[in-house]
Amino acid sequence: MQQQHLFRLNILCLSLMTALPAYAENVQAGQAQEKQLDTIQVKAKKQKTRRDNEVTGLGKLVKTADTLSKEQVLDIRDLTRYDPGIAVVEQGRGASSGYSIRGMDKNRVSLTVDGLAQIQSYTAQAALGGTRTAGSSGAINEIEYENVKAVEISKGSNSVEQGSGALAGSVAFQTKTADDVIGEGRQWGIQSKTAYSGKNRGLTQSIALAGRIGGAEALLIHTGRRAGEIRAHEDAGRGVQSFNRLVPVEDSSEYAYFIVEDECEGKNYETCKSKPKKDVVGKDERQTVSTRDYTGPNRFLADPLSYESRSWLFRPGFRFENKRHYIGGILEHTQQTFDTRDMTVPAFLTKAVFDANSKQAGSLPGNGKYAGNHKYGGLFTNGENGALVGAEYGTGVFYDETHTKSRYGLEYVYTNADKDTWADYARLSYDRQGIGLDNHFQQTHCSADGSDKYCRPSADKPFSYYKSDRVIYGESHRLLQAAFKKSFDTAKIRHNLSVNLGFDRFDSNLRHQDYYYQHANRAYSSKTPPKTANPNGDKSKPYWVSIGGGNVVTGQICLFGNNTYTDCTPRSINGKSYYAAVRDNVRLGRWADVGAGLRYDYRSTHSDDGSVSTGTHRTLSWNAGIVLKPADWLDLTYRTSTGFRLPSFAEMYGWRSGVQSKAVKIDPEKSFNKEAGIVFKGDFGNLEASWFNNAYRDLIVRGYEAQIKNGKEEAKGDPAYLNAQSARITGINILGKIDWNGVWDKLPEGWYSTFAYNRVHVRDIKKRADRTDIQSHLFDAIQPSRYVVGLGYDQPEGKWGVNGMLTYSKAKEITELLGSRALLNGNSRNTKATARRTRPWYIVDVSGYYTIKKHFTLRAGVYNLLNYRYVTWENVRQTAGGAVNQHKNVGVYNRYAAPGRNYTFSLEMKF
């Protein structure tokens, strides 16, 4: 019976790997009834599992392309929807800045595609006195999910696998190949997906073509997406909103009369003074508009967003006759645009703003006087850059972001299924990747309501204004990688050995350009009438003025070499890096598995700017894990690992405050992870509970070196990015899947339940004694504790299925938002990350699919089925001090409400 037992195990694992690969390797035999079967052969493509790279699988999640389709993943926010402890970092303008894991985020969570690091979150300091908190995008390019074969999410230090950036975790994507589209036993394949998401009116259309002729094969995927902003719950935007707008009214003063010279026949003062006009002054008028059209800090709805994405992936190759050797190429081009308007900026002037600006500017010649019946022409005040701006026009603030990724490369792959040579698998690849983030800020004051992004000042629109500011950040990599795998036995011990090597030449470049303003003036002068001396503005002696056509003035704001935000000198950092890693996962019979890995990284950076903190860094990372199997139904697991993050390019450039800063030595950030788990497994499925402890040290923040002078602490040198903090967190993670037919065989086959839970607790936060003007580390990046419970059914033949998910989130812990700031005088003050925190919430989602004749699959989902109104911490976190583009002066938090009941539909076709 032993042979039949092994056969049942193989079939069961195959079905579960298709349904939920994250748990596939833990499921044991026993779900089928005992019966004698004929010998058959089952061929299946190998699915990536949690324990492929690390023996314990602790902190790992794996999602395949099939999983992404079943979970209806259409964007970055859908990817981790049901995975507690992993959250998307909102960039504040529609894009994202990577992920947050275990209290860290952005550049402290590695993001790679086929081993290629994606662009860093680069936050440049903003202009003083402006509405922005960052001068650059701060985003990280998003991945096209229709190109993804599998994604592995690792929670906890993981630099032995992913290198720099995997301080708190990593997210690693693997790109599809032709085999993922070509069906078994076929020479070609076509896949198409059409999907609609109601939460953002998103439309996705993707088509994949693959073919094989002899040894030649190719894959082509094109994906297009369009979407808007994520719409808040309908209750959040109900009603109308009112605001004050400055409108012209006649001046009540008896000395406010005037005559315009060009409006008098023959330009004769005496013939016109009997019909003078009166100056205008500003008065607030209360106006009411829909919540969608309202502008100001009390806006109920999110800023409007227009999102578009176009992606091409082409992967040709040739497989030699013996199937062991493959040579191929890859070409990828993805462009995403995020165009948004910041509607928290009031479109219209108010009397308070008008008077304050006029007072600051002093007396403005011609204020109150206008030509013809155009009374708005007499209302203008002081604006930016010395320009005069009129109350006639509305202000619009727009951010246009374009993320462009280009990649092309070559690869050689050796696969030996017989495992009878020096390597079972070898891959040599070379990739050139360039990613650019073009962030264009535009401020217009030249259209009636501020909604026209394309309006510009002109001579016929006096007191109109426009400002442009563009920051383009790019990174390029030329990466050579080699990977080798070999399985072998020694003394009845099974070894799975892998070796990875890499060499990279990289460049980082930030360009500040198109930084200028335009404004339209008008010709104005006060005249003395020939026969009336010194008119005083009363009705009998009105002022005699000339109001003529205007002209457009353009002024450059860009400067060079002044070390402030207005410095448009290009920033360039380049260098090289290499790594070598070895890992061996050992099976010690049926009782234990042991694994260990070691990795060495070297990076050297250079810059023509002597103030850039370049240098050489050498780091050593390692991990070790063990799985004890005292019984068939029980695994005891434990792993330790380290992580590091090298200084980012923004940190190396430093903080510039007008003086020539000195380069400083910045060490890598370090982390140490300990994790222990227990796994129960059997016919019923599996259940895993784990405890983790993550310690972070040498965290990099902006501040000063401290020194003691005359018995008092004071700052030393210039502000810079320094190693200054350490922190420690602990937590628990639970996940599992229950097969109800395995629990009780009288229940129909196909019913299952899933469960996931994550909680993080802050244990310690410290600051180095030789640092000052430092903000203590605020853990706004921690996702509140969350439970996710699911109940589903998959028809055994895979024809149809339905799934319900309950998500419950606890409130954000206030203690994670409280901290202190060390002041320059040696004292400190209490600080708070943000003024608000989220309350507990829960939602119910239902989704299902139906397959027609194996070629067509209809999928549908109803999210927030009960139409519950709630706010996620990820949204509110955009108001926190650690946000990339912090939302300031928020009056109403309705705009952060999550969507109400919404629907997603998709049609998939596979041939």
UniProtKB/Swiss-Prot annotation:
It comes from the Bacteria. Residues 51-176 form the TBDR plug domain. Residues 1-24 form the signal peptide. Induction: By iron starvation. Belongs to the TonB-dependent receptor family. Binds both human apo- and holo-transferrin (TF), via the TF C-terminus. Forms a large complex with TF and TbpB. This is Transferrin-binding protein A. It comes from Neisseria meningitidis serogroup B.
